[in-house]
Amino acid sequence: MNTSVTIAGVTFKNPVMTASGTFGSGMEYGDFVDLNRLGAVVTKGVANVPWPGNPTPRVAEVYGGMLNAIGLQNPGIDVFLKRDIPFLQHYDTKIIVNVCGKTVEDYLEVVEKLNDSAADMLEINVSCPNVKEGAIAFGQKADCLFDITSKIKNEARKPIIMKLSPNVTDITEMAKAAEAAGADAISLINTI
């Protein structure tokens, strides 16, 4: 049975992919999951420089679920390109790299470095606080989302997926802003 799907010109052998953040780049899961069976691995967010993440405890079990505040811990794009991309290239799966940043310039620096990598698509996490806009997440104001999407689209040589924030009153307004700015796809949503 053919289970392939095509998104923004990229064909996946099946629609099963990991969610960013929960799977890292898959290195820790080799004993549990055959990465060759996945349509794609969506990596944990990567920034222009290493981020230490939040201090522990980062996860708490509560009645009816769990709370988490990881803080986008990541090794930075340079380590990621040397370690994670080569690891993922050993598998028959597409690579979608989740990109995070604190300023538009941070995002653009990561996107530029990923342009010549083996990544198939880029997922742009706009739930990150925008330090130039009073720490309001890029994805919480339609004009900020339009701006960052259009700037990334102009820089990227790979299809971009805008990963929207759940912390908005009307997510359709945000999706329309990303689409109008040239996003190739929309991903819903970051942690709530």
Task: Enumerate the language-model features and the residues they cover.
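N-terminal capping/small domains of soluble enzymes
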Residues: 1-95, 101
